[in-house]
Amino acid sequence: MFLLCVAGLPLSTIHAQKKEIIDDEAPNGIVIVTIDKAGDEIIRIMNESQLPYIHDPKAPRFLLMDKQGKFALGIGGYVRATGEYDFGGIVDDIDFVPANIPSSSKIKNQFQMDASTATIFLKLVGHTRLLGDFTVYTAGNFRGGDKTFQLRNAYMSFRNITVGYTYGGFMDLGALPSTIDFQGPNGATFYRATQLSYTYKGLKDFRFQASIEAPAVDGTTSSQFEIAQQRMPDFTASAQYSWNSSSHLRVGGIIRSMTYTSTERDKASSVTGYGVQASTTFNLGKKWQAFGQVNYGKGIGQYLNDISNLNVDIVPNPEKEGKMQALPMLGWYAGLQYNISPKVFLLSLIHISEPTRHLRI
């Protein structure tokens, strides 16, 4: 499969200039400024709140600001078009999802183009005595049904607390390689959840995070079972050590309770799932960047590329009548990126994700 990506409106990291306050007769009004004239504090918050994910838009070029320079609202996004040619009839989908590869296919060649990952966003940043540095962020693309708008992020962050809908705690955005394919690497954890999370940054070079998240459970059921309303949130925790701005090592975990109902007994039961993760990215000189991640657990298929669409969090237990079980899962990837120039790079990946081989349903 051959992939080609073209992106519009590329935005680089912004740099601070001397703070400028616009002085006129209406001190409480709103003005439009370019990002480089937003002032040191606004630029710092914009940069520090930028998530390390290649498909997230960077800071906007223009801002709406109050004339005291305390608050700024950015509106921005990008247009991204992807073209691909499939020489072997691999997957009838614009995304490369190995779990969907058929055992045989009549389609041998296929050309596709897609622009549904074009993204728009609103980002409000500022500083108050009560909230400290804060960010309110919403973003979406057009990956809903029939290319309709789909919400990707909607959250508020203040004093290291995040509330809302965004990337889950059982994943490492910084260790994801820069793939053209929007689906991302097979074997990585990737999901979004409504959550309450806290990040501790008080120890130099270390970062600790914990979150409570709304659960999402998919399972393979039969006439005997139904996936019930979930009674417990997911709990995640992680610790990360960084030795420079582009190198870190992270370990994390998740524990979850998955509720199901037996139609024969009319009774709700639950299965405990868990996951552990180790991930890293580090530079090898000025040109090379390495990426890697290993995930193992039970009942984490919902969060693991690319088996999240196979409904294998929980399945009927063939050894216990009337019971369901959480399947063991393993996923990993390793990548190496060569930066030809600041704007051009080459990437090679090896990855795998799978439920256990004893899947018996």
Task: Specify the residue positions occupied by each region the protein language model found.
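Outer-membrane beta-barrel and related beta-rich outer-membrane complex signature
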Residues: F87-V91, L151, S222, T263, ...
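Outer membrane beta-barrel
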Residues: D66-D93, S103-V217, T236, Q240-W243, ...
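Single conserved hydrophobic/aromatic residue that forms the stacking wall/gate
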Residues: I350-I361
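Extracellular/periplasmic loop regions
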Residues: Q289-M329, Y333-G335
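Bacterial Sec-dependent N-terminal signal peptides
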Residues: M1-K19
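N-terminal periplasmic/intermembrane-space "pro-region" immediately following the signal or transit peptide
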Residues: I14-Y85
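Extracytoplasmic loops and strand-loop junctions of Gram-negative outer membrane beta-barrel proteins
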Residues: P57-R61, I101-I107, S178-D181, T220-S222, ...
